[in-house]
Amino acid sequence: MPFGCVTLGDKKNYNQPSEVTDRYDLGQVIKTEEFCEIFRAKDKTTGKLHTCKKFQKRDGRKVRKAAKNEIGILKMVKHPNILQLVDVFVTRKEYFIFLELATGREVFDWILDQGYYSERDTSNVVRQVLEAVAYLHSLKIVHRNLKLENLVYYNRLKNSKIVISDFHLAKLENGLIKEPCGTPEYLAPEVVGRQRYGRPVDCWAIGVIMYILLSGNPPFYEEVEEDDYENHDKNLFRKILAGDYEFDSPYWDDISQAAKDLVTRLMEVEQDQRITAEEAISHEWISGNAASDKNIKDGVCAQIEKNFARAKWKKAVRVTTLMKRLRAPEQSSTAAAQSASATDTATPGAAGGATAAAASGATSAPEGDAARAAKSDNVAPADRSATPATDGSATPATDGSVTPATDGSITPATDGSVTPATDRSATPATDGRATPATEESTVPTTQSSAMLATKAAATPEPAMAQPDSTAPEGATGQAPPSSKGEEAAGYAQESQREEAS
């Protein structure tokens, strides 16, 4: 039985916790993310090492949805540049997802260790990402969280391939998507502007990745006071909406025109005019000889160390400020005027957020060239203009990530991404105005992801992690269905039923 997974339906057959420990040795936790703990696991039969992601069902609906989503998507895909699913076990209390183990380094670390780094090296990285994304897009899958942190080398060999990880935000594109999701510095204009979007958001993110790899700088940044996070983020989103970036000197002086052309086409503001992943693979900078061999390591590394190795900002402060601004668009200016005092009581800071959101869409950003967005700061996208949005509220997390909600709200995560929340703080009216929610809607009903992450970090882990032995024993898992697409659809349907409940 290659996969210890459940058959979806009214009657569920769960794996027994002992099935996991009978087959795998789970070491100590090597990383804690928003939704799961990550272990290095050893197959007792083959001795092969894998990565294990353990999701606790008791941690909430968003955690269960993320696990089901990742399982469903990974069962659909098989590509050399995507970490492959090895095994799945679902007990009554946990999800265990076993993946290939990537032992190489992140792309940033690889660049810093090189003696020679040129456009050709960047072209090789971008080509592999484009090939993986073109494959995903052929299946109508949108990754939605492409960023440098999710690109790693498969091993430490000289010619190691690049692999893409982290699929808990990936989504089947059944019609255009509307929930905001991703990592702020990589968000496409249509996501920041709360428009419906699809596969082109991944191509925009690849353009941002390419820009950083060629210059060491993020394309959108502002020079602000060290603690002025609100202005930084307000201007960041305004610049993204306008596509306001430059190939500034001296960082781009030695970069070929072909490279600049591909970046420009990937970062086209209008999503219907943006180059596709398949088209980008055929671009001369990827498939031809247009990429330069000139060594650009010194300039790129200097900027990487300046922009991304510095202190990673005070995330909690930055996210809290941004969340206040994000809550404000949910109420129209008319509704806010009619119930200002009630709004101030129920959602502190919302009024200040409204002012920031209005400024975000109405004023131009000052130019700057020193301050850069931190490598792993993750915050929620701002509204495109002063026009209020009608989707849900946002709750800040302590590490600066954001997650899309089923109703369009954004809740910060802990791994630099954006995932769906479940409650609403404003109800849209038929005339486009938003009606403030009652007081109880502002009270969280479940423990926040930030609190759970803090608990996980503070609680010492045993030498060997075991599945919950108190979980009720059930029948053994069923073999996977013959159709991966049907199984993935099953996970998606179950997730939707859970949200509806």
Swiss-Prot record:
The keyword Methyltransferase does not apply. Residues 387-428, 438-451 have a biased composition (Polar residues). Keywords: Calmodulin-binding, Cell membrane, Cytoplasmic vesicle, Membrane, Phosphoprotein. Residues 331-365 have a biased composition (Low complexity). Residues 24-286 form the Protein kinase domain. It holds the Pfam family Pkinase. The modification Phosphothreonine is found at residues 435, 459. GO terms for biological process: modulation of chemical synaptic transmission; regulation of modification of postsynaptic structure; signal transduction. It is found in: Cell membrane; Cytoplasmic vesicle membrane. One of its GO terms (molecular function) is calmodulin binding. Signal peptide: none annotated. Residues 327-501 are annotated as: Disordered. Belongs to the protein kinase superfamily. CAMK Ser/Thr protein kinase family. Interacts with calmodulin, in the presence of calcium. Does not appear to have detectable kinase activity. This is CaM kinase-like vesicle-associated protein. The lineage of its organism: Eukaryota, Metazoa, Chordata, Craniata, Vertebrata. The gene is CAMKV.
